[in-house]
Amino acid sequence: MAASVFYSRLLAAATLRSHRPRTALPAAAQVLGSSGLFNNHGVQIQHQQQRNLSLHEYLSMELLQEAGVSIPKGHVAKSPDEAYAIAKKLGSKDVVIKAQVLAGGRGKGTFESGLKGGVKIVFSPEEAKAVSSQMIGKKLFTKQTGEKGRICNQVLVCERRYPRREYYFAITMERSFQGPVLIGSSHGGVNIEDVAAETPEAIVKEPIDIVEGIKKEQAVRLAQKMGFPASIVDSAAENMIKLYDPFLKYDATMVEINPMVEDSDGAVLCMDAKINFDSNSAYRQKKIFDLQDWTQEDERDKDAAKADLNYIGLDGNIGCLVNGAGLAMATMDIIKLHGGTPANFLDVGGGATVHQVTEAFKLITSDKKVLSILVNIFGGIMRCDVIAQGIVMAVKDLEIKIPIVVRLQGTRVDDAKALIADSGLKILACDDLDEAAKMVVKLSEIVTLAKQAQVDVKFQLPI
């Protein structure tokens, strides 16, 4: 496949499915966004199939601890009683309770229990229990979760530290550097995207030689540029070098620390961690991928992963089934050009089977907002007749009652057209992509107008 989806996904400004700005694009990625890796849908394109697995903060912190990185003391609690016990064991006069949800903006979020904020400072084990009881088992709503929120199944209970200064640090993959790059800033504990937009000179970058790794002098140079005091530059550099270990060892695409701090004792600590992992490495990173929390994902994401499909739900009403991420985004663009709104991004890849095509239709039609479907296939490796078989099977098995416009070109296209013609189904064929897009937009508009007028309109298939 020439390209595919990078799963951390879409900017909140994009027409993202309401419950999931799917974690908006990682901050490190947005800092490097000027390299042209993002299209206007907010989807990042790679030269190979790549999806990112994100882990909860407490799991990421455990990986850092294994690497010898300095972090605050803390443990995960899955019940209020466990939170009480951990807070008591820490023996600190004040501790921090951090909701574990895979979404940004938790500090300003609201729980369905009414609790404001997903990060709370408490001053006794009893208060830790009371606060965690309002988090665990409750949904947290943030700008990134949308109206459906995200369930909080556990909280991280950790000691409170008092930072003198806060910094931002990340290691991420960057095409323009042809490998990993270190990113640092003296502006930590804030949205690094805002820093990149308002004061880009405050962000420093250091490319890493993928063969030699991080050199000590390189890490020291970055720490100095970030503004660490001379007395702790070496300590900061050591932590940076140690952070590269899990990045390399676990096939990470990003390790982000925000903030990395100098605390009141003069120690360098990583107070928070976000790590993304390349899903192409799942076959050799079973330990990591077994940690995936599917309760944080939409059911359609889980179904798509099982069928090895690249799917992202959006807010529109025109379903899209396409092979290849580049063609999929071009399809969304042309739908938008003609006044329509895509309901999804769905790339079936270059080697899709009849089963995968059927599963793709199940994903599309499970979204009740979808009023019409555009299938756009250019058969190179992908055979058009396989797609046609899947379409016919899906329409029959799923009893699809909404209009389907199919544009097929390439390998075995004549066989595909014959299969569709012989099926007896009212599947609208179109050779020209522009005409196909116009047609599917018009059909969605007809259904939309009918619904607004409270007129019951059904497309009966077969006719």
Swiss-Prot record:
Residues bearing Phosphoserine are 279
What are the Phosphotyrosine sites (modified residues) in this protein?
84
Residues under site feature: Important for substrate specificity: 94, 162
Source taxon at top rank:
Eukaryota
Cofactor note as given: Binds 1 Mg(2+) ion per subunit.
- The principal location of this protein is mitochondrion
State the family it belongs to: Belongs to the succinate/malate CoA ligase beta subunit family. ATP-specific subunit beta subfamily.
What protein name is recorded for this chain?
Succinate--CoA ligase [ADP-forming] subunit beta, mitochondrial
Modified sites of kind N6-succinyllysine: 88
